[in-house]
Structure formats: C-alpha cells, structure tokens
Amino acid sequence: MVTIGVDEAGRGPLAGPVVAAAVVLCKPRPSGLDDSKKLSAARRAELEEKIKRRCRWAVGVVEPDEIDRLNIFGATMLAMTLAVGALCEQLAHDEDVGEVLVDGNLTPHGRRPEWCWPARPIVGGDALEPCISAASIIAKEHRDRLMREAALAHPHYGWERNAGYGTPEHLAALREHGPTPLHRRSFAPVAQLQLL
C-alpha cells in the first residue's frame, strides 16, 4: 500500500492555472522537506530536482477558463483528481493506494465523480506530512515555471516576479493593458475591469 501526498499552488492569483501535485515518496525520502512557502527559491529548486529524480510524482493543471467555469474550489478539486489519477497510472499493478493525504480541510472525495481513493485532509499538512511537503514543492515550482513562460508572451504584468498574484505592479498593468486570456475573469479585480 502506498501513501500519496497532494497539495496545490495557485488558488489566489488573478492569472494562470491552478496546479496540484501528487507524490509517493521514495525511501529514503529527501531530507529537508517542508512547506514550499517556507523554503528559499534555491532550496525549493534543489528539492524539486531530488523529488522528481527519486520519487514518483504527477501534476494536474486546470486552466483559467476552466477555473472561471467551475470556480476556484471546483478547479482545485479537479486539479487534485487529475494529479492523483496520473500518478496512479505510474503505480505497479500490485501497488494499491492506502491513503491520499491532502493539504487543507477538504478533499475531492465526494466532490469529484472520478475520485476513487481513500483520502484524509490535513490542515497544515504541507508542514506536517513529508509527502504533502514534497507535493507542495512540485506544485509551486511547476506553476511558477508556467508563469515565467507566460510572462514572455505577456511581459507587462510581471508574472515572472508575482506569479499572477494581485500585486500593485500586476494590478496597474491590468488597468493599463486589460486582461489577457490567462486572467481569471471570475476573480473580482479582473471582473470589475470588464464592467468599466
């Protein structure tokens, strides 16, 4: 039986996808795992490389148009479901999922029809459970990379620095240049601009 850790990155930004990662830790597990928000960028990148090289992992990505259609909660549950489903495809036929540990107070169980694994929510799990810590690192690094790439096509918004969050720089660019296809139109600052 394997335990899978799941976490997401990108629920709060005004632009870009929400990304979930699912990780089955290797033995011995990489040392220094912690909540991705507590790690320096250099340490996160180092741990991401170790996790990707030595552990089994997958990501689920839900784009802004789907976030607008489902709402951010539904999109997060979908991203988690996609990540766990993709990871389970990597497992050997004789490996069963014992439990999926999800950062937060809710899981996709009963909220996504495709979710078929036993799940347990853990508030603050990204700092408490190493497999969730690993997932938080993979999710954040993956999403940050996507936003750096998106910044090349949309340079006015500073996404390589703010990852799509509503910083003063991003809000000023949004007012001046308007929303891009990567903006979440259901999020208040973007929706309010569309009403003007």
UniProtKB/Swiss-Prot annotation:
Keyword annotations for this protein, in alphabetical order, are: Cytoplasm, Endonuclease, Hydrolase, Manganese, Metal-binding, Nuclease
Recorded hits in SUPFAM superfamilies, A to Z, give: Ribonuclease H-like
Q: Which domain of life is it from?
A: Bacteria
Query: What's a GO cellular component annotated to this UniProt protein?
Result: ribonuclease H2 complex
Q: Which residues form the RNase H type-2 domain?
A: 1-196
Q: Which GO terms describe its biological process?
A: DNA replication, removal of RNA primer; mismatch repair
From the UniProt record, list the reaction(s) this protein catalyses: Endonucleolytic cleavage to 5'-phosphomonoester
Query: Can you tell me where the transmembrane regions are?
Result: none
The EC designation for this entry is 3.1.26.4
Q: Which InterPro entries match?
A: RNase_HII, RNase_HII/HIII, RNase_HII/HIII_dom, RNaseH-like_sf, RNaseH_sf
Positions of a divalent metal cation binding: 7-8, 103
The cofactor note reads: Manganese or magnesium. Binds 1 divalent metal ion per monomer in the absence of substrate. May bind a second metal ion after substrate binding.
CDD domains on file: RNase_HII_bacteria_HII_like
The cofactors required by this protein are: Mn(2+); Mg(2+)
Q: Where in the cell is it found?
A: Cytoplasm
The protein's GO terms of the molecular function aspect are: manganese ion binding; RNA binding; RNA-DNA hybrid ribonuclease activity
- Cross-referenced NCBIfam families: PRK00015.1-3 (NF000595)
Q: What does this protein do?
A: Endonuclease that specifically degrades the RNA of RNA-DNA hybrids.
What protein family does this chain belong to? Belongs to the RNase HII family.
The protein's name is Ribonuclease HII
